[in-house]
């Protein structure tokens, strides 16, 4: 029997959120790659950090992936303590050994991130974080809409022609007066896929007919959920921008249909429904913790909002070991907030409680998992758990 021929070696990105630039595949111990900048209809944007690609043909061969431009990416500190995620079946994602020089020198052009693995099969995927596909996004919308408590509303189209939808969720049979309007938006920055995993966990629990927390909240509140604010950027394999090259979380003060239709359409719907609480789910490249950022820098920040913030955080601390308040962005002086950010604009416009929720690309340093780090499943658990702090403040909103 003849020995099988050596498989062809290739790297491909022609799939949802695929992104990498191949410099050299000549040596398995020196696979040279560049992390590709965000891409839009007008060419490259300023951000580069997301990658997602498939490598074929090297089963049983020790590999070293060298990301040559890691030090020139948008958040080079994000590589310190970071480990690449990999998968054979695109279902189970695990972390692999990764190194980056922690003595970072911005003036140097030779700081390279390296990742090593010996693949079990001839096909393996690598990514910055566990991907969340557009197909799964559509499945999430479809499964949620099957609930009697959910109405899916079409808001309009993105620049690439994709649908923007919001899920309106409440117990219509409840006779509760003056229901509170609670918004959850996610993935303004498309490479922050943990944000949509967070929403998936949130929706699964909110729509669980046997969950007492969900039943009470659906009687008291109307939820408005946008699982993916940036579907174009998601499919294009972008870290932070949409198809027009816009960073959506800098568009809230004056969005346009030409540059940021996603924000324009959602903001328009918020003005229609009102907002009593808004959560904006994100991922942070550098900090290995889950945390929130509030609106204390707004000129309209009040003692009531501060009290609500403290109650919300205290409840989350008491109910989730994955949440903490010791590490975060620090406080912004009152009157110095950036009004183009969603949390700041919403809190100021509606005089309400608003948080940016940040999850790590790395791991939760307070509760690490050596196998998967922070992951899609852990993001889902955190999303399900946020219902408790919402319940703790619902009567005071």
Question: What annotation goes with each model-predicted range?
Answer:
Residues 75-76, 127, 134-137, 192-194, ...:
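Short helix/loop capping segments that flank catalytic or ligand/cofactor-binding pockets
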Residues 102, 106-160:
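Extended acidic/polar, glycine-enriched regions
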Residues 74-81, 136-139, 176-178:
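A short, polar/proline- and glycine-enriched secondary-structure boundary/capping micro-motif
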Residues 1-124:
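Extreme N-terminal flexible tails
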Residues 350-353:
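Short, proline-enriched alpha-helix->beta-strand connector loops that line the catalytic pocket
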Residues 149-171, 176-338, 344, 355-358, ...:
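Active-site/substrate-binding loop(s) of hydrolase catalytic cores
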Residues 112, 262-265, 382-385:
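Well-ordered alpha-helical segments embedded in enzymatic catalytic cores
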Residues 366-397:
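His/Asp/Glu-rich mid-to-C-terminal helical/loop segments that flank catalytic regions of hydrolases
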């Amino acid at each position: 029997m003849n020995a099988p021929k050596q498989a062809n070696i290739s790297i491909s990105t022609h799939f949802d959120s695929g992104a990498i630039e191949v410099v050299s595949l000549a040596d398995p111990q020196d696979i040279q790659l560049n992390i590709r900048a965000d891409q839009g209809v007008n060419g490259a944007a300023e951000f580069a950090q997301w990658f997602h690609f498939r490598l074929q043909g090297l089963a049983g061969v020790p590999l070293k992936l060298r990301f040559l431009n890691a030090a020139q990416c948008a958040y080079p500190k994000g590589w310190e303590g970071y480990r690449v995620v990999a998968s054979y079946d695109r279902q189970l994602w695990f972390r692999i050994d990764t190194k980056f020089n922690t003595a970072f020198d911005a003036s140097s052009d030779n700081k390279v991130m390296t990742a090593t693995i010996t693949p079990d099969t001839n096909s393996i995927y690598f990514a910055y974080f566990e991907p969340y596909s557009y197909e799964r996004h559509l499945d999430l919308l479809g499964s949620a809409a099957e609930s009697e408590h959910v109405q899916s509303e079409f808001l309009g189209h993105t620049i690439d022609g994709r649908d923007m939808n919001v899920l309106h969720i409440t117990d219509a049979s409840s006779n509760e007066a003056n229901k509170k309007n609670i918004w959850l938006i996610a993935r303004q920055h498309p490479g922050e896929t943990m944000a949509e995993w967070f929403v998936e966990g949130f929706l699964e629990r909110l729509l669980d007919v046997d969950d007492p927390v969900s039943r009470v909240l659906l009687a008291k509140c109307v939820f408005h959920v946008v699982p993916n604010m940036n579907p174009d950027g998601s499919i294009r394999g972008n870290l932070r921008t949409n198809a027009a090259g816009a960073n959506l979380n800098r568009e809230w003060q004056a969005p346009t249909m030409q540059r940021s239709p996603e924000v324009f359409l959602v903001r328009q719907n918020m003005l229609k429904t009102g907002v009593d609480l808004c959560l904006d789910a994100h991922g942070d490249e550098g900090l290995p913790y889950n945390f929130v950022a509030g609106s204390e820098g707004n000129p309209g920040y009040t003692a009531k909002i501060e009290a609500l913030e403290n109650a919300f955080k205290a409840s989350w601390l008491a109910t989730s070991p994955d949440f903490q308040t010791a590490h975060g962005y620090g406080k912004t002086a009152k009157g110095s907030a950036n009004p183009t950010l969603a949390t700041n604009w919403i809190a100021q416009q509606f005089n309400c409680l608003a948080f940016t929720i940040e999850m790590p690309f790395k791991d939760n340093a307070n509760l690490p998992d050596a196998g998967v780090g922070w992951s899609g499943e852990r993001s889902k658990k955190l999303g399900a758990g946020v219902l408790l702090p919402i319940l703790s403040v619902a009567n005071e909103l």
